[in-house]
Amino acid sequence: MEPDLHDQQQQQRVHSVVIITLPPSDDPSQGKTISAFTLTDHDYPLEIPPEDNPNPSFQPDPLHRNQQSRLLFSDLSMNSPRLVLGLLGISLLAVAFYASVFPNSVQMFRVSPDERNRDDDDNLRETASFVFPVYHKLRAREFHERILEEDLGLENENFVESMDLELVNPVKVNDVLSTSAGSIDSSTTIFPVGGNVYPDGLYYTRILVGKPEDGQYYHLDIDTGSELTWIQCDAPCTSCAKGANQLYKPRKDNLVRSSEAFCVEVQRNQLTEHCENCHQCDYEIEYADHSYSMGVLTKDKFHLKLHNGSLAESDIVFGCGYDQQGLLLNTLLKTDGILGLSRAKISLPSQLASRGIISNVVGHCLASDLNGEGYIFMGSDLVPSHGMTWVPMLHDSRLDAYQMQVTKMSYGQGMLSLDGENGRVGKVLFDTGSSYTYFPNQAYSQLVTSLQEVSGLELTRDDSDETLPICWRAKTNFPFSSLSDVKKFFRPITLQIGSKWLIISRKLLIQPEDYLIISNKGNVCLGILDGSSVHDGSTIILGDISMRGHLIVYDNVKRRIGWMKSDCVRPREIDHNVPFFQG
């Protein structure tokens, strides 16, 4: 007598396999997949009673499929309870591990795809991101050729024609905000710029300013420590350097009146009294080296390329600098002014954010090698979703700079003093406007003492080299060609942020190549200077030299600062099929 189907199922021994596949670490948005299989010891065919009235077009009710699944799981649970518990335990551990590694992706699993796509579309319509690539400083002819070939993809004879096409049909900001989410997300932006730590001592980007019919490109020194963007102008000019481009010519109807909010913002820290009835808004900014810029506030259109290649324009308030004095004039031989990127309301990112064009997030990535490229961006789209080290941003009502708190600082295994409150807590200020890094006096003296050990190796002090205060030459008198020749003699500097317990703190590691340079004489020089007379004298100023080779992000929305190691060739979030840098 043949056993019926129920008896067969009772006699079969059921096995199960559960496969959990996690997404790749570089693309957690693909989600996880869970596959379950059941196997039996005997090959009994599954017999399904025929329907009385079969209908070929009939689609099975999802409820029936769920009941079938519950039946199979019920049979399995009755026959192999230990196996079920074991599989459930493994599944829970896998899900918990995934949630800890990719919390954002797990949160995305909780909403439907339609809701998630709708939210993404809304967010993309609200803000966009701008990217400003940073290249090594080139000679004028090479720089001009790279602009033509890389940014415009054209030969020299087509340069004028391409500029006309680019300026005649700009996309208004309002049009950009109504652009489809897909086009914004797939676009890129490239502005040819130049700079290095040594010998130029600055990094700058190129921005188009003015109306479409008479717009002019200006090279601006990127400065996260400055609030005001300003350009040398003919108002007329009292003291101006030659600059990289012709002087900006302001229009009278573009001048900012003293009664406007931005004027009050700029003049709040100035010694001169605010004049509400004046027809113009005067400014005077003094920098750490005691050089200064004086001028008036004006307003004009800034043109910024979005990811999709379209050109957005927005009216931006900036300074028309007609009187520059001090060492500032030296940098203005290569640039036309300063691009203020601080937290201040009048900074460029803050103005764009107040108009809803971007999220108030600024990031920069300066490559480590001498011929390196890099970029800066405004907006949150290019902030990596993982791999960043984040620390709280210090809030200082008196200073709109990007600062964090540091609890320990060391050179190798030796501790360096912090000149903060009671010497226990110090502050670090991120400043792309400083070529080099500055330590408080006590920490600097301790570092110099610790570095005396390198003179006993293959190096000896060379006081004849005036590139920087401290330089060493090889005892063989053979000039060094790169930092790879000498970095083995030096030790890393570690900044510990947060708790003093190492296991729960964050660290910023400054490798020897992040604080040394090779001078024109072939010597190695210390790129950390005495900061006794810089800022308040007790703050660590992190300059360009120590930020190279890192992506550093200032998130003013979440009030945090983050960093990660990077080659700075291109933003991680930009599609590799989209040209970003050439050559």
Curated annotation (Swiss-Prot):
Role noted for this protein: Involved in proteolytic processing of BAG6 and plant basal immunity.
Protein name, entry field: Aspartyl protease APCB1
One GO CC term, this protein: membrane
GO biological process, one term: proteolysis
E.C. designation(s): 3.4.23.-
CDD domains: nucellin_like (cd05475)
Lineage, opening ranks: Eukaryota, Viridiplantae, Streptophyta, Embryophyta, Tracheophyta
Highest taxon above the source species: Eukaryota
Keywords annotated in UniProt: Aspartyl protease, Hydrolase, Membrane, Protease, Transmembrane, Transmembrane helix
Protein location: Membrane
InterPro entries: Aspartic_peptidase_A1 (IPR001461), Aspartic_peptidase_AS (IPR001969), Nucellin (IPR033823), PEPTIDASE_A1 (IPR033121), Peptidase_aspartic_dom_sf (IPR021109), TAXi_C (IPR032799), TAXi_N (IPR032861)
Main subcellular location: membrane
Effect of residue 431 to A: Loss of protease activity
Catalytic residue positions: 223, 431
Gene from which this protein is expressed: APCB1
GO-annotated molecular function: aspartic-type endopeptidase activity
Coiled-coil residues: none
UniProt xrefs under SUPFAM superfamilies: Acid proteases
Membrane spanning residue stretches: 83-103
